[in-house]
Structures are given as C-alpha cells and as structure tokens.
Regions:
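N-terminal beta-loop-helix "entrance" segment that forms/cooperates
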Residues: 49-64
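Short, basic, low-complexity termini and linkers enriched in Ser/Thr/Gly/Pro
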Residues: 1, 5-13, 67-77
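Glycine-rich phosphate-binding loop
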Residues: 61-69, 74-103, 107
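Short, ordered loop/turn segments at secondary-structure junctions
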Residues: 23-24, 52-55, 83-84, 119-124
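Glycine-rich phosphate/diphosphate-binding loop of Rossmann-like nucleotide-binding domains
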Residues: 8-52
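Generic secondary-structure signature for well-ordered alpha-helical cores
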Residues: 26, 34, 41-46, 63-67, ...
Length: 156
C-alpha cells in the first residue's frame, strides 16, 4: 500500500525549472513570464527560459526538455506560457487543443510535471484580467503549481 504523500510537508528548496514562453501576444506572455520567474526565484529555484515564436511551437521544446531531463534528472518541472486569442475562425481552438493534448502526453510519457498555462481566451479583456492583474496572474499560479508538483514528485 502506498503511503499518503503530503506535498506541503515535503520541502523542495531550489530545483531547476524551465519556462517555455511564446513570443506571440508578447505583452501578456511577458507579464506571466515575469510573475513566474519572480515566484520561482523567491523559492530559491534556478530558472531557464526558452522563447518560441508561438503557442504551437511550445510542445516540441517541452518534449525535448522533458526527454533530456529524463536522462539526467535536471529539471523539477516545465512551465509553458502562452496566450491564444480567439478570432473569427476556429484556428485558435485547433491550436489550443493541439497544444493541450501534446503537453498532457509529454508529461505522462516522461513523468515530469508540465504546467499548462497556454491560455485560450475570448478577447483582450480576458487576457488583461489573467495576465496583467495585480491580484491575479496566471504566471504566478503556474510557478506555484510547478513548485507543488516538484514536491509531490520528490515525495513519490
């Protein structure tokens, strides 16, 4: 029988976290990136940032980092940041679904937390609320989730 893992009690100080951030919708993604970096650095973590052109390019980099981490156990988690704004066609929906499915498969295959904060949003107002707000920033939430998952994985 597995013992119950209480991640709050397992201390993960430091660690190395990769952040993959899209260059598309830079204003919003950069705000999430700054917030995530700040949260991770506050926890004593080392942060590696990789910038990619758009959200669709995030999974291939996540897969490469996850595979390399499987070989040398260097990363505690991979955080993926992007903003996709819906338009008049279904293009954004297709990109969002492809990214979501790929990131889920990567974390299952490589057994490394892949934190999905590639936001599929209706409009710029939603982007402002989720990325630029002082009280609410998805970059901060992504970093907190990554730290929590690092604790969980270390405890297994």
């Amino acid at each position: 029988m597995l013992q119950k893992i209480q991640s709050k009690k397992i201390q993960v100080r430091g660690g190395t976290f990769a952040i993959i951030a899209s260059k598309y919708n830079t204003r919003y993604v950069d705000a999430m990136l700054r917030a995530a970096q700040s949260e991770l650095k506050r926890a004593g973590a080392k942060v590696v940032v990789v910038r990619v052109p758009g959200a669709y390019e995030i999974p291939v980099v996540a897969a490469k980092l996850a595979r390399l981490s499987t070989l040398n156990s260097q990363l505690s988690a991979v955080i993926c940041l992007g903003v996709i704004l819906r338009g008049a066609t279904t293009h954004a929906q297709h990109i969002g679904e492809a990214v979501r499915n790929a990131l889920a498969q990567i974390q299952i295959t490589h057994e490394i937390p892949v934190i999905h904060e590639v936001l599929l949003l209706e409009n710029e107002q939603q982007a402002k609320e989720r990325c630029l707000g002082r009280r609410h920033n998805r970059g901060t939430e992504a970093a907190q989730t990554a730290l929590e998952m690092a604790r969980v994985m270390k405890g297994l």
